[in-house]
Amino acid sequence: MAHTFKEAARFRDLLWFLITLGIYQSGVSTVVVLAAIYAQEVIGFDTQSLIILIMVVNVTAAVGAFVCGHLQDRMGSVPTLAITLVIWIIAVLAALFATMSLDMWIAGNMIGLAMGASQAVGRALVSKFSPSERAGEFLGLWGLVNRLSAILGPLSYGLINYLSNGNHRTSLLSTLAFFIVGLLLLSKVNESRGKAAAISSGALMDDAG
């Protein structure tokens, strides 16, 4: 795995995107793990309402993934992901200031749209930035970053929740920060340059062969 990281470091935009992915995906993982608890303990959702919300969010996630595909074709993956992260930020802000069930329904469906889109576009970008002969290796890094984020995000939320005496709204600020920082880091990723580097490396490998 260390060798794979060393190889990935040769591709500036791939490495920068993996760092970006690790940050914003920490926010995504936190929402996936703790959204239900937030809805119940902060907004007062009962079990039945929560189940219905989760079912609807799954539908909006599918819609988000579908729309994401069309946006990537028209705009590119990086602009599409930027839009997705803005939606995440707005959704988390909506949840942060939610005071009634309707607020959480709005936030939840925005989360669904963003979740479906961000999962799809993240993998697509790693594929674009990976030389064909190393695609499997670098997609393995993508998976590793996702797994690490699944630990970092909820852990940060839990730590702040503990330090704030169980204040979920304060804890949610860490989740919001992940998306804001992720969006800022994404501005350093150049999709055209990253694709060109992957293609160029592949051509060099072919010539060497």
Task: Describe the role of every protein-language-model region.
Residues 33-49:
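Short amphipathic helix-loop junctions that connect adjacent transmembrane helices
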Residues 117-131:
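Intracellular juxtamembrane helix-capping segments at the cytosolic ends
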Residues 173-206:
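Multi-pass alpha-helical transporter architecture, strongest
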Residues 79-94:
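Structural signature of the two symmetry-related core transmembrane helices
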Residues 159-179:
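A membrane-interface helix-boundary motif in multi-pass transporters
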Residues 1-19, 204-209:
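Juxtamembrane intracellular "pre-TM" segments in multi-pass secondary transporters
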Residues 63-77, 161:
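Helix-to-loop junctions at the C-terminal end of transmembrane segments
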Residues 96-108:
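Helix-loop junctions at membrane interfaces in 12-TM secondary transporters
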